[in-house]
């Protein structure tokens, strides 16, 4: 039995609130149960130096956790003077995932910067960030089209992400912190709306997992991501 009494395949309640802040071209508050992340998408004309003159755009991401997003306060990384390895890994994951769903040629020489700020953490912050950031990205692209900055829609498909794992010998979806911290296997999966894989991050935290368990976890993730994409589409409509 899971601590929340959810079934193994059941995700937490998921909500996506668009236009959550006033200034960003795209902004979303995404909630996976008690995990809450503010995702903003900022559209700027121009690209990094390494892309100048190539006629294509760029999408990148930054990620951070507010000091009291966790049970005890942690120092801001800006106060420490450097980002942790975890932060760098997560923001690279978010950026890679979002670049997979954008036609960079159609974006033109423009840049979208995604900022994911964790307001409250209860497991799955990186997967919630990707899910919310995708919706914020859609809004930023629609803003640019409305302004005539880009002509065609660069979005190739929606993407979403979920954590899956093996907890007390059972494959489960959308782990909250108490499950994540005690899981034998922890995996983050990013997929397209049609179920194609963009990225898999999987680690045997306690016990090695079998090929059959890997397939079970991926099937669990695919079904959960299908449900999460439905939430994205409902928010966008």
UniProtKB/Swiss-Prot annotation:
Q: Which InterPro entries match?
A: ExoRNase_PH_dom1, ExoRNase_PH_dom2, ExoRNase_PH_dom2_sf, PNPase/RNase_PH_dom_sf, Ribosomal_Su5_D2-typ_SF, RNase_PH, RNase_PH_bac-type, RNase_PH_CS
* Assigned keywords, A-Z: Nucleotidyltransferase, RNA-binding, rRNA processing, Transferase, tRNA processing, tRNA-binding
Which amino acid positions bind phosphate, per UniProt?
Answer: 86, 124-126
- Name the Gene Ontology molecular function terms of this record: 3'-5'-RNA exonuclease activity; tRNA binding; tRNA nucleotidyltransferase activity
User: What Pfam families does this protein map onto?
Assistant: RNase_PH (PF01138), RNase_PH_C (PF03725)
**What Enzyme Commission number does this protein have?**
2.7.7.56
Q: Which CDD domains match?
A: RNase_PH_bact (cd11362)
State the Gene3D superfamilies in the record.
Answer: GHMP Kinase, N-terminal domain
Which principal EC class is assigned to this enzyme?
transferase
Q: Tell me which Gene Ontology terms the entry assigns under biological process.
A: rRNA catabolic process; rRNA processing; tRNA processing
Known partners and oligomeric status: Homohexameric ring arranged as a trimer of dimers.
- Family note: Belongs to the RNase PH family.
Q: Which NCBIfam families match?
A: RNasePH (TIGR01966)
Its annotated function is as follows: Phosphorolytic 3'-5' exoribonuclease that plays an important role in tRNA 3'-end maturation. Removes nucleotide residues following the 3'-CCA terminus of tRNAs; can also add nucleotides to the ends of RNA molecules by using nucleoside diphosphates as substrates, but this may not be physiologically important. Probably plays a role in initiation of 16S rRNA degradation (leading to ribosome degradation) during starvation.
Q: What is this protein called?
A: Ribonuclease PH
This chain is encoded by the gene named rph
């Amino acid at each position: 039995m899971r601590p929340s009494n959810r079934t193994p395949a059941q995700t937490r309640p998921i909500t996506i609130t668009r236009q959550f802040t006033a200034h960003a071209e795209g902004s979303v508050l995404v909630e996976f149960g008690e995990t809450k992340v503010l995702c903003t998408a900022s559209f700027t004309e121009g690209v990094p130096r390494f892309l100048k003159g190539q006629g294509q755009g760029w999408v990148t991401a930054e990620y951070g956790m507010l000091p009291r997003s966790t049970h005890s306060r942690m120092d801001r990384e800006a106060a420490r003077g450097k980002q942790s390895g975890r932060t760098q890994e997560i923001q690279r994951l978010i950026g890679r995932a979002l670049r997979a769903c954008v036609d960079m040629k159609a974006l033109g020489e423009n840049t979208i910067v995604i900022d994911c700020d964790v307001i409250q953490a209860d497991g799955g912050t990186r997967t919630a960030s990707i899910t919310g950031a995708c919706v914020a990205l859609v809004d930023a692209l629609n803003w640019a089209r409305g302004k005539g900055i880009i002509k065609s829609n660069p979005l190739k498909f929606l993407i979403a992400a979920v954590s899956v794992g093996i907890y007390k010998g059972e494959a489960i979806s959308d782990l909250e912190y108490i499950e994540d911290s005690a899981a034998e296997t922890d995996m983050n999966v990013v997929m397209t709306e049609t179920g194609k894989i963009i990225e898999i991050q999987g680690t045997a935290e306690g016990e090695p997992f079998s090929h059959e368990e890997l397939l079970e976890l991926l099937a669990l993730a695919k079904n959960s991501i299908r449900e999460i994409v439905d939430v994205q589409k409902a928010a966008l409509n």
